[in-house]
């Protein structure tokens, strides 16, 4: 009997430790969610990927725990309702090594008010829970909770949002403050009572509350763009003030890089690539060409563009310009090409940056090389007019590439200033007005408006020198030019490619050498095969028969053996 009680005591101690371990792994700070009647609310909880996920569930806490939905990695979803589980809950694994479990509440009312429990069961971590308290706001005056603002900030900066802007609201201990964040209809509580309570991995160690309930977010990241932060102040029961602030994030791109693909063929085709990295939210790439050709020279020019988003959320733009000359230049002709990037900046400004220039002297053997460009120096003259642009609150998608022809018959083209510093001009569109004087612009290239698919203007005489066309649209032009353009250029180090004296390009020479080697190799193989065939057709050499074998006998005196002559006959 004594041994039985001992075993029971040891078993009870082990069970107490197991239960204690599970309770220690269970966590959850209650968050208050405020919603208006008839609105949609999304409740989202997250947890770190530690151990093995057993299951997760949503429950409503009343006198008892009412199961709403369960998710199991192997068995899928189960919902205790007539509606489909896909319209009630959602499970995701977003970046950041976390699990995300969302409950959708549609058309909320007073019956929806209550506490909702989100729980994760992990092995061997245990059970982790999070409780949300949903409260329906009633008798809220419309003019009290609608107060929206927008803040623009550069990446890696410190975001400071006052609870109420341009409002003489006296801070009192009687008032209840709470900061919430909203994205795509999902609303989460960041702080309550002046203390951060959100366990979201996106805002971990980045949120701080000031003495006057200002929200500080540092450092600002790319994925903060579009977040709406709301400050809720409960003045008295049924009276809630709300001020919402939307964040717009900007990133200054790198200086564009321009290179030439070493693939010029016999018809004089040149391919240039302009690349721009770390772009957010958008940018425009514009090609500039300064050239001087004798009369009768013709060319075809078109651009293509592409963009992609890297793993950090930045955009990378690339524009490819192809220029093909029909005739071989009879004289020494120069070609200078570069690209410019325009991207929006906070405060309705624009970041301007220009690539280095590449200068070619077609038909010349030893072209000069220019000196490098100072990035803060104006290189193109007077800034263009941007009177029709608007603020960066509604940016267009980037047109990515445009083409500007600087060479005309006798026109004087005023080019935009290319500086890396900010300029006090609106940022949407980046369309320019180019002015020219002299003869009619009938010799200029046809154009297409940026970011549209409309056809070029009718007639070559209706276009202006320096027009911009969409990079993704092929626009071929035959432009005879009769005069050189004198333009002030800052010298920039460029890549210079010269042609041989005889005018033959190096790909043709390499192809001829390879063809000669191939012919010689084929002749050698053919000669070897003929030699092998002759060897196989020769008759086999004559081989004489072997000589006869003679046997010798050694006679012994013992026994009656046969004499030697008899053995020889055998």
Curated annotation (Swiss-Prot):
Residues 253-359 form the Ig-like C2-type domain. It is a single-pass type I membrane protein. Residues 1-21 form the signal peptide. GO terms for cellular component: membrane. InterPro entries: CD96, Ig-like_dom, Ig-like_dom_sf, Ig-like_fold, Ig_sub. Keywords: Cell adhesion, Disulfide bond, Glycoprotein, Immunoglobulin domain, Membrane, Repeat, Signal, Transmembrane, Transmembrane helix. Its main location: membrane. Residues 22-504 are extracellular. Residues 526-570 are cytoplasmic. Residues 450-461, 469-486 have a biased composition (Polar residues). The keyword Disulfide bond applies. Residues 38-125, 156-222 form the Ig-like V-type domain. Gene3D superfamilies: Immunoglobulins (2.60.40.10). Glycans are attached at residues 42, 107, 148, 156, 166, 184, 261, 284, 334, 352, 374, 431, 484. May be involved in adhesive interactions of activated T and NK cells during the late phase of the immune response. Promotes NK cell-target adhesion by interacting with PVR present on target cells. May function at a time after T and NK cells have penetrated the endothelium using integrins and selectins, when they are actively engaging diseased cells and moving within areas of inflammation. Homodimer; disulfide-linked. Interacts with PVR. This is T-cell surface protein tactile. It comes from Bos taurus.
């Amino acid at each position: 009997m004594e041994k039985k009680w001992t075993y029971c005591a040891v078993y009870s101690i082990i069970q107490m430790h197991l239960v204690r371990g599970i309770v220690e792994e269970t966590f959850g700070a209650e968050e208050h969610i405020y919603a208006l009647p008839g609105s949609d609310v999304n409740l989202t909880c997250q947890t770190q990927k530690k151990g093995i996920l057993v299951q997760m569930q949503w429950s409503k806490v009343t006198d008892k725990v009412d199961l709403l939905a369960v998710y199991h990695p192997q068995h899928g979803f189960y919902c205790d309702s007539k509606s489909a589980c896909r319209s009630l809950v959602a499970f995701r694994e977003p970046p950041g090594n976390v699990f995300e479990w969302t409950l959708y509440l549609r058309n909320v009312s007073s019956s929806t008010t209550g506490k909702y429990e989100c729980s994760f069961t992990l092995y061997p971590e245990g059970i982790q829970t999070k409780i949300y308290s949903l409260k329906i706001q009633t008798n809220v005056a419309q003019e009290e909770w609608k107060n929206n603002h927008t803040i623009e900030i550069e990446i890696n900066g410190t975001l400071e949002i006052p609870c109420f802007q341009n409002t003489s609201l006296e801070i009192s201990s009687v008032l209840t403050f709470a900061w919430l964040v909203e994205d795509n209809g999902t609303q989460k509580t960041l702080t309550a009572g002046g203390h951060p309570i959100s366990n979201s991995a996106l805002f971990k160690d980045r949120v701080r509350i000031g003495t006057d309930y200002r929200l500080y977010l540092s450092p600002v990241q790319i994925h903060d763009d579009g977040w709406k932060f709301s400050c809720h102040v409960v003045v008295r029961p049924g009276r809630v003030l709300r001020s919402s602030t939307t964040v717009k994030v900007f990133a200054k791109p790198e200086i564009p890089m321009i290179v030439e693909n070493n693939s010029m063929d016999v018809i004089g085709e040149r391919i240039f690539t302009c690349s721009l990295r770390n772009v957010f939210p958008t940018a425009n790439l514009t090609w500039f060409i300064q050239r001087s050709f004798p009369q009768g020279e013709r060319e075809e020019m078109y651009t293509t563009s592409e963009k992609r988003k890297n793993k950090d959320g930045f955009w990378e733009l690339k524009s490819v310009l192809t220029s093909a000359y029909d005739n071989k230049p009879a004289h020494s002709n120069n070609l200078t090409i570069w690209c410019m990037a325009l991207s929006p900046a906070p405060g309705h400004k624009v970041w301007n940056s220009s690539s280095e220039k590449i200068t070619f002297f077609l038909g010349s053997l030893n072209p000069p090389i220019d000196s490098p460009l100072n990035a803060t120096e104006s290189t193109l003259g007077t800034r263009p007019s941007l009177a029709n642009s608007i603020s960066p609150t509604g940016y267009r998608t980037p047109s990515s590439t445009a083409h500007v022809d600087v060479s005309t018959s006798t026109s004087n083209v005023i080019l935009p200033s290319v500086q890396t510093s900010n300029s006090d001009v609106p940022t949407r569109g980046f369309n320019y007005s180019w002015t020219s004087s002299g003869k009619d612009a009938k010799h200029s290239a046809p154009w297409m408006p940026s970011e549209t698919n409309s056809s070029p203007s009718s007639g070559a005489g209706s276009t202006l020198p320096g027009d911009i066309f969409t990079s993704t649209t092929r626009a071929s032009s035959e432009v005879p030019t009769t005069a050189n353009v004198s333009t002030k250029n800052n010298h920039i180090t460029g890549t210079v490619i010269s042609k041989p004296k005889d005018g033959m390009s190096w790909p043709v020479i390499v192809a001829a050498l390879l063809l000669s080697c191939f012919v010689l190799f084929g002749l050698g193989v053919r000669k070897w095969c003929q030699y092998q065939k002759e060897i196989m057709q020769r008759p086999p050499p004559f081989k004489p028969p072997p000589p006869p074998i003679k046997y010798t006998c050694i006679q012994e005196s013992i026994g009656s053996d046969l004499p030697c002559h008899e053995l020889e006959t055998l």
